[in-house]
Swiss-Prot record:
One of its GO terms (cellular component) is ciliary basal body. This is Protein Flattop. Keywords: Cell membrane, Cell projection, Cilium biogenesis/degradation, Cytoplasm, Cytoskeleton, Membrane. Microtubule inner protein (MIP) part of the dynein-decorated doublet microtubules (DMTs) in cilia axoneme. Acts as a regulator of cilium basal body docking and positioning in mono- and multiciliated cells. Regulates basal body docking and cilia formation in multiciliated lung cells. Regulates kinocilium positioning and stereocilia bundle morphogenesis in the inner ear. Residues 127-213 are annotated as: Disordered. InterPro entries: Fltp. Belongs to the Flattop family. Pfam families: CFAP126 (PF22611). The gene is cfap126. Residues 151-213 have a biased composition (Polar residues). It is found in: Cytoplasm, Cytoskeleton, Cilium basal body; Cell projection, Cilium; Apical cell membrane; Cytoplasm, Cytoskeleton, Cilium axoneme.
Amino acid sequence: MSTSYSANQYESAFKSQKLQNWTIPKQFKERPSAAEGYTTFIATDRGHLLPGVRTKHRSAWPAFQGTWDLPRRIPPVSMNPTARSQVGQDRLMTWGQMKITTKQAHKGPGDSQAMNRNSHDVENINVDQPAEQSKISIDPDENQPEKPKSQHIQDQSRPASQQAQPIPENLNINQSRPASQRSQKAPSRPATQQNQAEFRPPTHNSRPASQEK
């Protein structure tokens, strides 16, 4: 233990031959003089600007308003129907989605006629409603579902004899089946079982009085 360590074991780290980057320090000026023509003083030691320095007259917070500087009433945001025509604007007003418009929309060449037509239709909505209700009660075919176009074309292509034949509602299922399936449907019981059921004595069906109790 004692042979591997010595009292001056850390002494070799501080020898001059190990300190290769150690040199005598150079002389330096304690208070260097300011370079002339390159720097100008604009503030004092405390940070106050000198009187000859140009300043901006605008405020640093141009849009800032304090609590007491706010207006009493802030107007609502106005909608700008820029790309909406007059017809679309009138449609929105009839739907009730846009009540107040501050700016006029772009007017197209045929917007005046369409606007008059729209206003006329809106006025006649309440007048046309009772007539439509009477039509609904008169027409019996309205409850039936509408046929697609392909069925209408097939009905027109059929001859008049086939179109005139109505299909009864209470059609028997056996009549709609082919003759081969009708013949296959025979009575469920053979004749021997039916005869046995007819000639069965009544004693089998009736129970004695002791069993009934």
